[in-house]
Structures are given as structure tokens and as C-alpha cells.
């Protein structure tokens, strides 16, 4: 009788509603059925873990409920985007190997061993009838890494050059840079806040989700005293590998710095936040990539001329002169496409069982295949 290709030894683990511990078995399958149980084990839960699990189990409109419902809503919006892609590309769903979906980061605490990107990839797979690959960051964190940034490996694939050092700067909610050395080595790390604080301030004082074309910031003046107060943040002095997020750089962080500057015009604060983004990026380039021949910007901030102008000036002020700042359009990839392309690439790597992280970037102990597969 032919052997089932899925036959072999499997472990099964189950911790039930009693929350007393986890039961496990090691079982060999033959012809798709358990042929022999090789071992069993039980590991009890400590009282502290049981108490934590019972507390999390309480029903109601709590954080767990809100996260789950938000994840469902996100998956629905992701499905709309996928349908648009199918329509616009005229590619049948059956030809799509996989959807690589990052999810929405709501917590990033690698120092505590976790990062959380909410999403419901099972629901997305059910709606699209296409394999979905998600949860890219957690394996890197499990291997001792920061789980971020992940895009430098992709940047190296598409933007690297043998004869010069290049910097790719992503200006999303958080800024990060990838250093593509002429030698072929790659470094990358988060620099600090970008659109996260700029958008927060624009929403508060303009009633708009972002500062379109940087007009709000252009109407203000950089306040050097406030800028220095903002720069007095320990994260900016940390050595890479490092990553950050809205856990640190959020409205509360900004508001805690502002009381001595209550007389400042709102536009001046916005201009100073632009300067903060530019200076923190420029300082890292000066420290780690002073031989760069060009800086290529992607992400939402690439469409803000005030940030690009400020970054060019900050580089000059940092002693990195004559290095042009331009968008990734110059390399043939529109700034808005870089990150979704990166997660399509990571999905492809997962399908091929190839590593997607760079330990030199994230600090992980070794290369790892990233992502969890949710079959169609």
C-alpha cells in the first residue's frame, strides 16, 4: 500500500478550559491515521499563568473583544483591496500563489518577547479563496530579534548596487533606514517618529488626517529649543539593532514635552516635528553611512516636500554633504509600492521556505523563514 505523503511523527498539544496545564502526545501516522502513540506528557500551569488566563477569559466589551472585531473589519478591507487588485490586474484568483499581509501593528514590544499585528488571515483566506501568509514579525522576535525592520532584505534585492553605498529611507509612521553598502553588506533600523506625530498634530489642529504636501509645516518656523527637547529621548542615542513604534512615539509622548512651549504657534510645532524626522534620520546616516552616494525615500512621507527638503538640509548640517535626497521613483519603484512589494516578496520567500530576515538588521540569532500560512 502506498505511503501517504503526510505520514510521519506529529506532536499534538491541547490546553483546555480547565486551564490546569497542557496535555501532549507524540503519535505516528500511517495512511492518514494514528498508528501508534509514542509518548504522552502533561505540563501543569503555574498559579500566576492560570490567574492571567482566567482574567483574559472574562467576557464583555474589553480589549480582547475590540481587537477581534477590529481584526475582522481589517480582513474585510483587505479583501476589498485584493478584489481591486484582481480586477485591475486581470489576473484570475486561481493564478495568485499567495497574499502576503502584514496586518496592523498595535503593540511592538520585542524586549518583552512579542509583537502584535492584528488581522484575521483565516477570514481573508476564506473570503478570497487564496492562500494567505501573515504574522511575519513574530518568528524573528522568537529568535531574539527586534522583528523590525523586515524590509531591508527586500531593499537589498531590488535596490542594491555593487559600486556604491545607498540608503533607502522609509518614512511611514516611523522612519527607518536601510544601508546598502557597496561591499554587499546590509544594515537597517528604525530612526524615530515620522508621520505618526505629524499626522497626529495635523488631525488635532487642522481636523485633517495628514498635512497635505506639508503646507501646514511650511507655514511655521522650527523652534530649536523645542527640537532639542524632543531630541532628548534615549531611543535616539541607542545603537542598532533597534526598533520602535507608537508604543513610544505617540500623542502622550509629544504632549509631555509641550507644556513649556504653550505659546508656540501650531504651525511652528508642525515644522519642528518635520525637523525632528529629518534630523534623526540624518544623524543615523552620518553615524553609519557617511559614504552614501544617495538617499532614496519611500513611504507616505516621500510625498511631503517639506520633509524631503528638511532631510536634505539636515544631511548638510550633519556633515554629509553632496548626497542627493530623492524618492525611489528614481530607481523605478514608486514610493507607495515599496512596502506592499516587500510583503509580497516575503510571502514568496515563505512559500519557498527561504529566510526573510537579516540577523545583522534585526539582531535575531539566525535567519528564519517568516510568516504563517493560511491555506485557501
UniProtKB/Swiss-Prot annotation:
Q: Which reaction does it catalyse?
A: 1,6-anhydro-N-acetyl-beta-muramate + ATP + H2O = N-acetyl-D-muramate 6-phosphate + ADP + H(+)
Q: Which UniProt keywords apply?
A: ATP-binding, Carbohydrate metabolism, Kinase, Nucleotide-binding, Transferase
> What Pfam families would the database entry show?
AnmK
As recorded in UniProt, its EC number(s) are 2.7.1.170
Tagged with keyword Nucleotide-binding: yes
Give one GO biological process term: amino sugar metabolic process
Keyword tRNA processing present in the record's keywords: the answer is no
The residues that the entry says bind ATP are: 16-23
Task: List the GO molecular function terms.
Answer: ATP binding; kinase activity; phosphotransferase activity, alcohol group as acceptor
Top EC group? transferase
Pathway assignment = Amino-sugar metabolism; 1,6-anhydro-N-acetylmuramate degradation; Cell wall biogenesis; peptidoglycan recycling
Q: Which HAMAP family match?
A: AnhMurNAc_kinase (MF_01270)
Tell me the NCBIfam families matching this sequence: PRK09585.1-3, PRK09585.1-4
Q: What biological function has been recorded for the protein in this entry?
A: Catalyzes the specific phosphorylation of 1,6-anhydro-N-acetylmuramic acid (anhMurNAc) with the simultaneous cleavage of the 1,6-anhydro ring, generating MurNAc-6-P. Is required for the utilization of anhMurNAc either imported from the medium or derived from its own cell wall murein, and thus plays a role in cell wall recycling.
Q: Which family does it belong to?
A: Belongs to the anhydro-N-acetylmuramic acid kinase family.
Spell out the protein name for this chain. Anhydro-N-acetylmuramic acid kinase
Organism, scientific name: Paraburkholderia xenovorans (strain LB400)
Amino acid at each position: 500500500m502506498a505511503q501517504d505523503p503526510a505520514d510521519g511523527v506529529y506532536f499534538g498539544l491541547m490546553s483546555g478550559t480547565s486551564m490546569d496545564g497542557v496535555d501532549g502526545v507524540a503519535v505516528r501516522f500511517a495512511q492518514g491515521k494514528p498508528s501508534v502513540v509514542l509518548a504522552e506528557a502533561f505540563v501543569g500551569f503555574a498559579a500566576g499563568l492560570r490567574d492571567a488566563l482566567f482574567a483574559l477569559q472574562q467576557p464583555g466589551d474589553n480589549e480582547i473583544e475590540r481587537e477581534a472585531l477590529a481584526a475582522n473589519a481589517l480582513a474585510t478591507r483587505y479583501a476589498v483591496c485584493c478584489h481591486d487588485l484582481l480586477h485591475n490586474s486581470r489576473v484570475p484568483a486561481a493564478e495568485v500563489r499567495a497574499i502576503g499581509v502584514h496586518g496592523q501593528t498595535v503593540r511592538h514590544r520585542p524586549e518583552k518577547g512579542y509583537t502584535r499585528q492584528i488581522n484575521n488571515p483565516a477570514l481573508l483566506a476564506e473570503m478570497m479563496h487564496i492562500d494567505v501568509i501573515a504574522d511575519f514579525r513574530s518568528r524573528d522576535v522568537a529568535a531574539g530579534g527586534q522583528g523590525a525592520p523586515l524590509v531591508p532584505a527586500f531593499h537589498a534585492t531590488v535596490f542594491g548596487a555593487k559600486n556604491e553605498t545607498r540608503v533607502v529611507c522609509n518614512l511611514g509612521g516611523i522612519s527607518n533606514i536601510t544601508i546598502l553598502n557597496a561591499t554587499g553588506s546590509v544594515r537597517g533600523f528604525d530612526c524615530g517618529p515620522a508621520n505618526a506625530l505629524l499626522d497626529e498634530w495635523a488631525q488635532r489642529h487642522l481636523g485633517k488626517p495628514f498635512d497635505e504636501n506639508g503646507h501646514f509645516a511650511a507655514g511655521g518656523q522650527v523652534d530649536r529649543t523645542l527640537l532639542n527637547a524632543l531630541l532628548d529621548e534615549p531611543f535616539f542615542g541607542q545603537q542598532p539593532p533597534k526598533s520602535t513604534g507608537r508604543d513610544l512615539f505617540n500623542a502622550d509622548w509629544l504632549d509631555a514635552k509641550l507644556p513649556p512651549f504653550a505659546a508656540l504657534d501650531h504651525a511652528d510645532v508642525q515644522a519642528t516635528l518635520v525637523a525632528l524626522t529629518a534630523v534623526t534620520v540624518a544623524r543615523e546616516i552620518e553615524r553609519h553611512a557617511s559614504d552614501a552616494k544617495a538617499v532614496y525615500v519611500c513611504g507616505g512621507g516621500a510625498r511631503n516636500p517639506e520633509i524631503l527638503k528638511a532631510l536634505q538640509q539636515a544631511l548638510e548640517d550633519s556633515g554629509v554633504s553632496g548626497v542627493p535626497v530623492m524618492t525611489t521613483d528614481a530607481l523605478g519603484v514608486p514610493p507607495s509600492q515599496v512596502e506592499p512589494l516587500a510583503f509580497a516578496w516575503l510571502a514568496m520567500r515563505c512559500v519557498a521556505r527561504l529566510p526573510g530576515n537579516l540577523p545583522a538588521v534585526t539582531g535575531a540569532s539566525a535567519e528564519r523563514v517568516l510568516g504563517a500560512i493560511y491555506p485557501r
